[in-house]
Curated annotation (Swiss-Prot):
Family label: Belongs to the 2H phosphoesterase superfamily. YjcG family.
HAMAP family the record matches: 2H_phosphoesterase_YjcG (MF_01444)
Entry-linked InterPro entries: 2H_phosphoesterase_YjcG-like, Cyclic_Pdiesterase, YjcG
Chain positions of motif HXTX 1: 34-37
UniProt protein name: Putative phosphoesterase OB1230
Motif position, HXTX 2: 115-118
Keywords: Hydrolase
Keyword flag Hydrolase: yes
TM region positions: none
EC number: 3.1.-.-
Active site: 34, 115
Native source species: Oceanobacillus iheyensis (strain DSM 14371 / CIP 107618 / JCM 11309 / KCTC 3954 / HTE831)
GO molecular function annotation: hydrolase activity, acting on ester bonds
Gene3D superfamilies reported for this sequence: Cyclic phosphodiesterase
Length: 170
C-alpha cells in the first residue's frame, strides 16, 4: 500500500487554498491542502508497524513551530504548478530530514521546497494569467504546526489519514 507524510494547515489556510484549488487544481478532491513532508512510499504491515513507532519517536523529539506564508511561487519551467510558499525554517527542515534518514528511505526526487499547492496541470496561458494575478495579491498567513499525519492512498487515488502524530508529546 502507498503511504505519505504531510502537515495539514489550519482551517483558515485550507479555506484560502481551497478557494483557489477548486478552480485550478484537477486533483482538488483527492487530498485536502497540505505540506508534503515525505513523498509516497510503499509499506507492508510489518514495515508499517516499524514506521509508526519511528514516527512516534520523531514527533516526541520535535517541538511545535510556526510557519509563515508571504507569497505564491511556482515550479516553472519544470511544471506549471503554483503554490503558497512556506518560508523555510530550521525546525521544518529538521523534521523533513528526520523523515529521510535512519530507518526511512531517502525517496526524494526533488530538493525540499516547503509549499502548499494551489494550482497545477494548467495550460501555459492560464498559468501565466493566474500567477500574475496571485503575485499581485498580498499574502500574510501564519500557522502553528503541532502535528503531522501519516496518510495512505485508497484505490480511487484519494488520500486519507492513517494516524496523527502530535509534536513534543508521547
Amino acid at each position: 500500500m502507498k503511504y505519505g507524510i504531510a502537515i495539514f494547515p489550519s482551517k483558515t489556510i485550507q479555506d484560502q487554498a481551497n478557494a483557489l484549488r477548486k478552480r485550478y487544481d484537477p486533483r482538488y478532491s483527492l487530498i485536502p491542502p497540505h505540506l508534503t513532508l515525505k513523498e509516497s512510499f510503499e509499506a507492508d504491515e510489518e514495515t508499517l508497524s516499524e514506521t509508526v513507532e519511528e514516527l512516534r519517536k520523531i514527533a516526541k523529539e520535535t517541538e511545535p513551530f510556526h510557519i509563515q506564508i508571504n507569497k505564491v511561487s511556482t515550479f516553472e519551467p519544470v511544471t506549471n504548478t503554483i503554490y503558497f510558499k512556506v518560508e523555510p525554517i530550521q525546525q521544518l527542515n529538521d523534521l523533513h530530514t528526520k523523515l529521510h534518514e535512519g530507518k526511512f528511505d531517502d525517496n526524494q526526487t526533488h530538493p525540499f521546497v516547503p509549499h502548499i499547492t494551489i494550482a497545477q496541470d494548467l495550460e501555459h496561458d492560464e498559468f501565466s494569467d493566474i500567477l500574475g494575478r496571485l503575485q499581485m495579491e498580498g499574502f500574510n498567513l501564519e500557522d502553528y504546526v503541532d502535528r503531522f499525519q501519516l496518510l495512505y492512498q485508497l484505490d480511487n487515488e484519494s488520500w486519507t489519514v492513517y494516524q496523527t502524530f502530535v509534536l513534543g508529546r508521547d
